[in-house]
From Swiss-Prot:
Designated name of the protein: Microtubule-associated protein 1 light chain 3 beta
Function: Ubiquitin-like modifier involved in formation of autophagosomal vacuoles (autophagosomes). Plays a role in mitophagy which contributes to regulate mitochondrial quantity and quality by eliminating the mitochondria to a basal level to fulfill cellular energy requirements and preventing excess ROS production.
GO cellular component assignments: autophagosome; autophagosome membrane; axoneme; cytoplasm; cytoplasmic vesicle; endomembrane system; microtubule; mitochondrial membrane
Gene Ontology molecular function, alphabetical: microtubule binding; phosphatidylethanolamine binding; ubiquitin protein ligase binding
Length: 125
C-alpha cells in the first residue's frame, strides 16, 4: 500500500529546493511537477509515482491525457486535475505558464487529482 504521507511530508523544504535546482540544471526545458491523489479520493487509483518532469511546451490537456492513461481510466470516468489543490486551469494553457504563476516556494508545481469537482473547497496537499 502506498505511503499516506504527501511529497512535502516525505521531503524537507531544503531537500525539495535542492531537488528542483538539480532538475532545472540537468533538464532546463522540463517542469518539475508533483501530482498526488486528493486525500479524500476513493474512486481513482494512486499513481505509481508522484514526481513528473513535464516538457515545458506541453499544455494542460496533454498532461491530463498522460495522467488518465497512467491511471488506466476509461473515457467515461470523471477526472479533475487541480493546481495547488484549489484551481482548475484552462486545458489550452501551456504548463510553463501554469508553472510561472502557480509554482510553490520550493520550486515544484503541485497538483492533485480527484474524481469530483471540489470548487469552493480548499484542498490540503
Amino acid at each position: 500500500m502506498p505511503s499516506e504521507k504527501t511529497f512535502k511530508q516525505r521531503r524537507t523544504f531544503e531537500q525539495r529546493v535542492e531537488d528542483v535546482r538539480l532538475i532545472r540544471e540537468q533538464h532546463p526545458t522540463k517542469i518539475p511537477v508533483i501530482i498526488e491523489r486528493y486525500k479524500g479520493e476513493k474512486q481513482l487509483p494512486v499513481l505509481d509515482k508522484t514526481k513528473f518532469l513535464v516538457p515545458d511546451h506541453v499544455n494542460m490537456s496533454e498532461l491530463i491525457k498522460i495522467i488518465r492513461r497512467r491511471l488506466q481510466l476509461n473515457a467515461n470516468q470523471a477526472f479533475f486535475l487541480l493546481v495547488n489543490g484549489h484551481s482548475m486551469v484552462s486545458v489550452s494553457t501551456p504548463i510553463c505558464e501554469v508553472y510561472e504563476s502557480e509554482k510553490d516556494e520550493d520550486g515544484f508545481l503541485y497538483m492533485v487529482y480527484a474524481s469530483q469537482e471540489t470548487f469552493g473547497m480548499k484542498l490540503s496537499v
